């Protein structure tokens, strides 16, 4: 099973990092080497991080926890939305609104407004307004739908948040840390892994890479939700500490770097 995942990761380019000039030194333990001024991630560390994250997300999902998936960059949005919907979890794929977590009550009230607008558009009520007002209401609806639609199922603060590229989503990470929400992230060579509870070192700019990681995590959530409450681990909501990187890089990583 692990060999199949490693093969899929290599095919998806999960091991490709950023240009060496953009690296964060704190990612050094997860880097195998460099090629053509591009850092190559140790695929074994990516596998370890992914399996650790899958186990944890499966456990918390089995315990009924909410997991918020966040990825607003162009390469991530579609996969984040698709896989979050598939596993029945809330998501943010367009824009992180300040206060999404720390001012959650306001976000819930805005969702109420979104539902009001939908009801207005679904019936004939909108025809009672002038053309100018209808246009204004439709613009308001489209903007709110784009930014808030993925949060409809988040009726409380999440216990866990998964982030694609925590460097870009630093505001989301900051809010999660402030509230004690466990963070899991796909993190590239230019980010700081010390800010994340469970880092998955990997390519966060490649569409295929993000799709592959999101699919694996969604599968884990679905599997966890299929368990009964009594089958869940007793301390499922306590995130395990990220294990120290292995001293020797994986053979698969060496092969991957030579293949380019």
Curated annotation (Swiss-Prot):
CDD domains: RPS2 (cd01425). Residues 231-260 have a biased composition (Low complexity). SUPFAM superfamilies: Ribosomal protein S2. GO terms for cellular component: cytosolic small ribosomal subunit. PROSITE patterns: RIBOSOMAL_S2_1. GO terms for molecular function: structural constituent of ribosome. Residues 225-260 are annotated as: Disordered. Belongs to the universal ribosomal protein uS2 family. PANTHER family: 30S RIBOSOMAL PROTEIN S2 PROKARYOTIC AND ORGANELLAR (PTHR12534), SMALL RIBOSOMAL SUBUNIT PROTEIN US2M (PTHR12534:SF0). This is Small ribosomal subunit protein uS2.
């Amino acid at each position: 099973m692990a060999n199949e995942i490693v093969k899929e990761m290599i095919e998806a380019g999960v091991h490709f990092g950023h240009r060496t000039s953009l690296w964060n030194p704190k990612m050094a333990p997860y880097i195998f080497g460099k090629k053509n001024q591009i850092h190559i991630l140790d695929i074994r560390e990516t596998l370890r991080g992914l399996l650790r994250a899958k186990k944890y997300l499966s456990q918390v999902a089995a315990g009924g926890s909410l997991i918020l998936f966040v990825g607003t960059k162009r390469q991530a949005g579609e996969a984040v939305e698709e896989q979050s919907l598939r596993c029945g979890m809330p998501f943010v794929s367009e824009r992180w609104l300040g206060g999404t977590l720390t001012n959650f009550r306001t976000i819930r009230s805005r969702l109420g407004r979104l539902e009001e607008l939908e009801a207005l558009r679904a019936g004939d009520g909108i025809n009672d307004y002038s053309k100018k007002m209808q246009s204004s209401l439709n613009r308001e609806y489209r903007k709110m739908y784009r930014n808030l639609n993925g949060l409809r199922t988040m009726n409380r603060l999440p216990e866990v948040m998964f982030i694609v590229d925590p460097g870009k989503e630093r505001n989301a990470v900051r809010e999660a840390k402030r509230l004690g929400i466990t963070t899991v992230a796909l993190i590239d060579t230019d980010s700081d892994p010390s800010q994340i509870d469970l880092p998955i070192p990997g390519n966060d700019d490649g569409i295929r890479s993000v799709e592959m990681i999101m699919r694996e995590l969604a599968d884990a959530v679905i599997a966890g939700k299929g368990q009964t409450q009594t089958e869940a681990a007793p301390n499922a909501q306590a995130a395990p500490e990220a294990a120290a990187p292995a001293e020797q890089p994986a053979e698969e990583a060496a092969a991957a770097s030579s293949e380019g």
